[in-house]
Amino acid sequence: MRIRDMMTKNPMTVDSETLVLDAQKIMEENNIRRLPVVDKGKLVGMITKHDLLEASPSPATSLSIHELNYLLSKMKVKEIMKKNPVTLAPDTPFEEALRIGQEKKIGSFPIVDKGKVVGIATESDIVRFLTRALGIREEGSRITIEGLGGKLTDLEKIISITNQHQTIILSMISMSRPEKKDWMIVLRLNTSNPDPIVKDFKKAGFNVTYSAWFRCETGSV
């Protein structure tokens, strides 16, 4: 999965001369929290709702309401925007984007292709992608298998047993657990009755520690 597959394409933008009040209005009217700042087709910054809040004078200020309104009415985006934001290319792998976001504590990325802003990827886009990838909105069953040795043969057996029951795998997550020196797999299967599959997993020697049917309305078991 690439960033181009999950980003919001052709996002709204403002230029650096845009008044802060106008940028705030755009965010409110379009229910968005971030705006790339583009001058003459080139990305020069990013402005967020948090930036707007920080730009607002403190309630403890000695300025009058008239003076406050005057200052805000003259303030421009270029005065409070974050300059030179970290960008990603459309073909950046999702995992790489997630790693960069965690390391740099970034909640969103402008997506730039050949110098042009073509999209934006935010926390909401990431959550939507993970929801789809994990099959959370689809009804089915969840099965957890622990104590695996990380062998390819284990994975082959799990898939083979699932196929024998003509059941679709909605998602499969494999996690290493260094503290226990083993691996754990969490399966989401397109079946309302996981018991026969669990029985065959156990016959094959797998340690099934959890199984249940879940509803898509809650996204959980």
Region locations from a protein language model:
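Tandem CBS (Bateman) regulatory domains
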Residues: 1-10, 49-86, 93-102, 122-179, ...
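Short proline/glycine- and acidic-rich turn/helix-capping motifs at secondary-structure junctions
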Residues: 43, 176-183, 212-221
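Short basic, glycine-rich beta-strand/loop surfaces that mediate nucleic-acid
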Residues: 183-191
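Conserved short beta-strand edge segments in small beta-sheet-based binding/regulatory domains
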Residues: 170-172, 199-219
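Short acidic-hydrophobic, aromatic-tinged amphipathic segments that line or gate anion-handling sites
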Residues: 14-15, 88-89
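A glycine-centered beta-loop-beta connector
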Residues: 27, 35-51, 101, 109-124
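Short, basic/aromatic recognition patches
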Residues: 18-25, 98
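Short acidic/polar active-site loop segments enriched in Thr and Asp
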Residues: 33, 107, 168
